[in-house]
Amino acid sequence: MKPIQLENYFEEQNWNWGEYFKFAFVRNPWASCVSKWEYRKRIMNNPTKRQKENGFHDKSKNAIRSWKSFEGMIRQGLAGISTSPQYLWVFGKDSEQLVDFVGKCENLQEDFNIICDKIGIPRQQLPHANKTKHKHYTEYYNDETRQIVAEKYAKDIEYFGYAFGE
């Protein structure tokens, strides 16, 4: 749920939005695209996992099946998968930040610790689930695909301080 939707829900419930600590996590857009590609490969190369993709919409299934290469996925406009820029989940209509803290997946444990400290709960070690082994995300890109992602996610890159290769 987007923060603006939550804010509206709080208002309907007569809860004070300002009394709560709100946070979101974002991910490097280039790394995120590689993750989507690697997920596609796992699904399409594993009949058991392919059976479990029933939760996907038909449009997503068809898009995933149509990708023959990482470059193809990027060039096709990342069609049919969840590709909304992340800033839409963090900022409101007037570019005001709707959450109190934005963590980065690249710093997950450290940023989670900040959240624990802020809300007054003991720090905990997060489990590392769904880890995949693949090359560093920068090795998937050429100049063209790097630029396509940079243009699509320009505001994410700007607002959250991302740069290719960092």
Segments and roles (model prediction):
Residues 1-166:
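Membrane-interface amphipathic segments in extracytoplasmic regions
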